Amino acid sequence: MNVFTSSVGSVEFDHPLLLENDLTSLSINCDDVHCSSRALCYIYDIHSSRHPSIDEHQFLRLLHGPDDAVTLGSFLKTLIWILSHDKNLPEEYRLPTIMMSSSYVKFFTEVKPRPPSTNCWTCRMSKDNLPFTVPSVKGFPPDAELYIVPISDHDGKPVKFDNRKTLYRSPSKKRHKYVISSDKPPLSARYVKYVDSSALESSPGSSPAVL
């Protein structure tokens, strides 16, 4: 598979994929099957509608070679959706789309899993999913002794711990679930007491975290 780009001459047609990347033409050859600029722009329009976070620059980088398995997988799903569900697909784009899906699936032998997100506040603050103290939490008395207590990892696996203070359920919708340990009741009604016997019990051979 070869990706061809050009910034020389007149632009083939007015489309953001070309204009935003300062290109006049863009094409791919997959096993001697030519995928034109128009076909790639058509695919981009559908892919960006399914994944609004991707822009023209990211899509061009994707065409040259995906960075991770998640990005590659979402692109292949778009190609498959086009072939199986897109009733407006021009017939001349069908074979190039088939060949692209066949070529890009081979990238799975090269790409690596996406690294864990560093945007999770709990992961940054907690070492090995252990409770950690915080100076304040909105909705709790300013003089309360407060801890953030992770109760599951990102895969949903419960975290074992031995608690000696009252726990309150956080209204947070974050994937890394946690509760708040406080020696004083909250001032806000949105926090309610949390009880989970499976998380409070220590399994044989484990060393639960102690507050």
Curated annotation (Swiss-Prot):
<keyword id="KW-0899">Viral immunoevasion</keyword>
<dbReference type="Pfam" id="PF05310">
    <property type="entry name" value="Tenui_NS3"/>
</dbReference>
<dbReference type="GO" id="GO:0003723">
    <property type="term" value="F:RNA binding"/>
</dbReference>
<comment type="subunit">
    <text>Homodimer.</text>
</comment>
<protein>
    <recommendedName>
        <fullName>Suppressor of RNA silencing p3</fullName>
    </recommendedName>
</protein>
<dbReference type="InterPro" id="IPR007974">
    <property type="entry name" value="Tenui_movmnt_prot"/>
</dbReference>
<comment type="function">
    <text>Acts as a suppressor of RNA-mediated gene silencing, also known as post-transcriptional gene silencing (PTGS), presumably through the binding of dsRNA.</text>
</comment>
<keyword id="KW-0694">RNA-binding</keyword>
<dbReference type="GO" id="GO:0030430">
    <property type="term" value="C:host cell cytoplasm"/>
</dbReference>
<keyword id="KW-0941">Suppressor of RNA silencing</keyword>
<keyword id="KW-1035">Host cytoplasm</keyword>
<dbReference type="InterPro" id="IPR043105">
    <property type="entry name" value="Tenui_NS3"/>
</dbReference>
<keyword id="KW-0945">Host-virus interaction</keyword>
<dbReference type="GO" id="GO:0052170">
    <property type="term" value="P:symbiont-mediated suppression of host innate immune response"/>
</dbReference>
<keyword id="KW-1090">Inhibition of host innate immune response by virus</keyword>
<comment type="similarity">
    <text>Belongs to the tenuiviruses p3 protein family.</text>
</comment>
